[in-house]
Regions:
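Conserved post-Walker A coupling segment in P-loop NTPases
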Residues: 84, 98-162, 170-186, 251-256
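N-terminal accessory segments that target, anchor, or regulate ATP-driven/P-loop NTPase machines
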Residues: 1-80
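Substrate-gripping "pore-loop 1 plus following alpha2 helix"
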Residues: 161-164, 190-211, 220
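Conserved AAA+/SF3 P-loop NTPase catalytic/coupling segment centered on the Walker-B
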Residues: 109, 145-152, 169-199, 215-219, ...
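Dynamic helix-loop-helix/coil hinge segments at AAA+ ATPase domain boundaries and subdomain interfaces
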Residues: 71-96, 148
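Nucleotide-binding/hydrolysis machinery
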Residues: 130-135, 206-216, 223-267
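The cytosolic transmitter module of two-component sensor histidine kinases
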Residues: 8, 81, 88-92, 186-190, ...
Length: 267
């Protein structure tokens, strides 16, 4: 196997005096690694009316670099820092200190606590304090769609023989994927996700081509994930991957002294 082309040739823009440019995803498969490039092809003519292409200009860049640029342009970046989270109660300070420590290691992280206590904001802060802060932060909620759509959203899909779309697992490569309400992730998808994270490879639904990924998961759960796993209600392999580092987010009622400060911060 030398080169595999994903047959994508959609016009990107009319540039260079109205000449259409075309985009191709190119996958180079070697014995050691799979490389993915995005190649832009610009056909050059003597004039706009000339039908004959005299030459072409091609520009290639690693597809992960392009996805990072697109992610930032699309707003897939952290909006909150850990320092923006206010509170002086002992439970809050300890949680924040642990978040700073865990942000700097390479483990996946589970945020555990009641709904509405700021787990998503905490995920933003951890990403911003991590070594992946220059990469994208992409979010997904397991309760927001059907299992079929959720599967495609995470892994991507080939919609027909010519068109293939990346999933958020790919788009978050070199960055962080925040998975909210992960306890509601269907078992079949949980098994696929555990396999992808273990092997650091994924494939889009409807395709067999494997793509390398480098992504950190920050998951959030309202429930005790380890307890659900013990009861057989959550995939054990995925649980083992994401529960190595747990941050328990204290409820607001357990830190009533922080309420006035939070109110001022909101105002």
């Amino acid at each position: 196997k030398d080169v595999v082309l994903n047959y994508t040739h959609t016009p990107i823009y009319d540039g260079f005096q109205g000449i259409s440019c075309y985009n191709r995803e190119t996958t180079w498969i070697t014995n050691n690694k799979t490389y993915e490039d995005i190649t832009t092809v610009v056909p050059l003519k003597n004039s706009e009316d000339d039908e004959d292409v005299q030459s072409v200009v091609t520009v290639s860049m690693p597809i992960e670099d392009l996805r990072t640029l697109v992610a930032h342009a699309s707003g897939y970046t952290a909006k909150y820092s850990l320092s923006s989270m206010v509170g002086e109660s002992k439970a809050f300070v300890q949680m924040k200190e642990r978040a700073y420590r865990l942000a700097r290691n390479k483990n996946h992280i589970l945020l555990q606590g009641e709904a509405g206590i700021g787990k998503q904001r905490l995920a933003h802060g951890i990403h911003m304090a991590s070594m992946r802060m220059a990469g994208p932060l992409i979010s997904i909620n397991c309760a927001d769609s059907t299992p079929e759509l959720l599967e495609q959203d995470i892994f991507g899909a080939a919609t027909d023989s010519d068109v293939s779309h990346p999933g958020k697992l790919e788009l978050a490569s070199k960055g962080t994927l925040f998975i909210d309400e992960i306890e509601k992730l269907p078992s079949s998808i949980a098994k696929m996700l555990a396999k992808a994270l273990s092997e650091k490879k994924t494939h889009r639904i409807g395709e067999s081509l494997e793509r390398s990924i480098d992504v950190r998961i920050i998951a959030a759960s309202d429930a005790n994930l380890r307890r659900l796993t013990e009861k057989g209600q959550f995939d054990e392999k995925l649980s083992n991957i994401i529960t190595r580092s747990i941050i328990r987010v204290p409820s607001l009622r357990s830190r009533k002294d922080d309420i006035p400060m939070k109110a001022v911060n909101i105002i």
